[in-house]
Amino acid sequence: MAFSKLLEQAGGVGLFQTLQVLTFILPCLMIPSQMLLENFSAAIPGHRCWTHMLDNGSAVSTNMTPKALLTISIPPGPNQGPHQCRRFRQPQWQLLDPNATATSWSEADTEPCVDGWVYDRSVFTSTIVAKWDLVCSSQGLKPLSQSIFMSGILVGSFIWGLLSYRFGRKPMLSWCCLQLAVAGTSTIFAPTFVIYCGLRFVAAFGMAGIFLSSLTLMVEWTTTSRRAVTMTVVGCAFSAGQAALGGLAFALRDWRTLQLAASVPFFAISLISWWLPESARWLIIKGKPDQALQELRKVARINGHKEAKNLTIEVLMSSVKEEVASAKEPRSVLDLFCVPVLRWRSCAMLVVNFSLLISYYGLVFDLQSLGRDIFLLQALFGAVDFLGRATTALLLSFLGRRTIQAGSQAMAGLAILANMLVPQDLQTLRVVFAVLGKGCFGISLTCLTIYKAELFPTPVRMTADGILHTVGRLGAMMGPLILMSRQALPLLPPLLYGVISIASSLVVLFFLPETQGLPLPDTIQDLESQKSTAAQGNRQEAVTVESTSL
């Protein structure tokens, strides 16, 4: 716990922490545009088969209306509109008869869209669906693109967690911003869908490093009393980015322009990130006290605290001798499951991360199916997410981490299950429940960011965060895939999302400790001390209750 006292000597909360938060707000505003980009860049426009009589101008009869030509060229689809995936082999002139019925033609009279499709460009001038014809028999390639993107975050979460502990938080953050910028910009030049997916994977790989490095740097430079507020502010920036995406996509209807707008800012963010100091906690753990002292003095100078000039290497080493000793002990992924005090919380957090992201991404990637203006709906989702996260700091001050985490996940699950009972024609009420669930997920994700950092000590914090992100991204990959079962079992996806969310809230209640008001643990011994203190407190409370009753 000694580093917490050293951080207080460097000012605790001041100008540096404010500038740091403002710096991290920039990527948090832009990351949602990358993650949720395909709600718009891969939106499915209205489409039908290309036909000679309708779309070959020289073959169109001048005495027939476009509606009549459509009637004899395209069969009706399931929703009574023009079929999106089939056309008549030959013009069905008999359908012009007002008395014609569905029996006037048969399936044998139709064929697939062998000459391609005609797309409605009234909403989007261009999408990747229209560019590579990801419709009809190829419609499964659209969710594949999102799954590949999520797999990039999955792999990156594991790799960057290990690399950040080995090489430091700061260089990984700058590199990942540059990687995302280059890969994201390059996608507009992709000649094939395969190359596009590969570049999206590389961009997502870098995004995972931005998540891990930025959040860890922020947590490790923030005092215990301000940690919840700081993380909530950053979470609100993420929500604002979601809302802004709706406006950005409304203004930029071409997928290439939208992709550039979401990628180019990361070039600037990569340069800006170099002013940030390296984590002094990490430098201490890695046996680099001289550099740690320099960073602490730098922060103190920015905060205007002259007392830190008296901080010497001897005082630093004396204060953090437990951390230095801990750094000499070999740590690996196995420590999360072999060390008794870490085992239960590691397993429980794996379950919580996995289940939370299954339900969350199943909801946010299903935007177009709500049947409303997706630009407005995206902005609405971001706004309610902002409100949910903004209230998190206040809620955490009174109710604690465990209560908020469990309660918000349970409420989100109940909102999803309630939506199952609402008829399809009551779209407004369905949107209300969806927005309520999104807001609860916003609270849950903000709380989880703080909670998991407080559950693990410094030597394994990045490794744990990397593993949790990896498992969470497995859930994120599963969320959209579950939606594919809707064609056979329409109620299965929301049922799974709701039940999984409620079940994970019970895991939080029964298997995770409360960390409210506790200093950030620097060693495994700190966790043991917290556990012993909590046990003594429980025994004392039991004695007090018994004495009162007597």
Swiss-Prot record:
Q: Which residues cross the membrane?
A: 11-31, 143-163, 175-195, 201-221, 232-252, 257-277, 347-367, 379-399, 403-423, 431-451, 464-484, 491-511
The record's listing under SUPFAM superfamilies reads: MFS general substrate transporter (SSF103473)
Q: Which organs or tissues contain this protein? A: Expressed in placental trophoblasts, syncytiotrophoblast and cytotrophoblast. Also located in the proximal tubules in kidneys.
Give me the gene this protein comes from.
SLC22A11
Q: Name one GO biological process term.
A: monoatomic ion transport
Official protein name in the record? Solute carrier family 22 member 11
Q: Which organism is it from?
A: Homo sapiens (Human)
Its main localization is membrane
Q: Say what the protein does.
A: Antiporter that mediates the transport of conjugated steroids and other specific organic anions at the basal membrane of syncytiotrophoblast and at the apical membrane of proximal tubule epithelial cells, in exchange for anionic compounds. May be responsible for placental absorption of fetal-derived steroid sulfates such as estrone sulfate (E1S) and the steroid hormone precursor dehydroepiandrosterone sulfate (DHEA-S), as well as clearing waste products and xenobiotics from the fetus. Maybe also be involved in placental urate homeostasis.
Catalyses: estrone 3-sulfate(out) + glutarate(in) = estrone 3-sulfate(in) + glutarate(out); dehydroepiandrosterone 3-sulfate(out) = dehydroepiandrosterone 3-sulfate(in); prostaglandin F2alpha(out) = prostaglandin F2alpha(in); prostaglandin E2(out) = prostaglandin E2(in)
